[in-house]
Regions:
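Short N-terminal "domain-start" leader segments
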Residues: 1-18
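Short, mixed-charge low-complexity intrinsically disordered segments
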Residues: 2-3, 50-82
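Short amphipathic alpha-helical segments that mediate assembly, nucleic-acid/protein binding
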Residues: 5-9, 45, 70
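Short aromatic-glycine-(Arg/Gly/Cys) micro-motifs in beta-strand/loop hairpins
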Residues: 14-33
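Ser/Thr- and Asn-enriched, surface-exposed coil loops between beta-strands
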Residues: 21, 43-45
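A short, exposed loop/beta-hairpin motif centered on an aromatic-Gly-Thr core
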Residues: 31-43
């Protein structure tokens, strides 16, 4: 099931607290459950997207940049900020 805005907000807040630079929302197309992937400052967000998107029944749905305004990103239809 697609993640709710509330769930995504919680994941983004957790990412901010842990010092992540981005939160990637990934859908497992086996059971259609969404989950977060946290990108640390020593990781490449593009690499983290590439190793997941379209592989092993995974689909990257959104990318939140934690250095940008979170509320604006949450209001977008599909956030994609690498």
């Amino acid at each position: 099931m697609a993640a709710s805005k509330r769930e995504i907000r919680e994941w983004v807040e957790r990412g901010v607290k842990t010092g992540a630079t981005h939160v990637i929302i990934v859908c497992d197309r086996w059971d259609y459950e969404d989950y977060p992937v946290y990108v640390d400052k020593d990781q490449s967000v593009n690499h983290e997207i590439d190793i997941r998107d379209g592989r092993n029944m995974l689909k990257v749905m959104e990318v939140y940049n934690l250095s940008m305004d979170i509320e604006e990103q949450l209001e977008e239809y599909c956030a994609w900020h690498v």
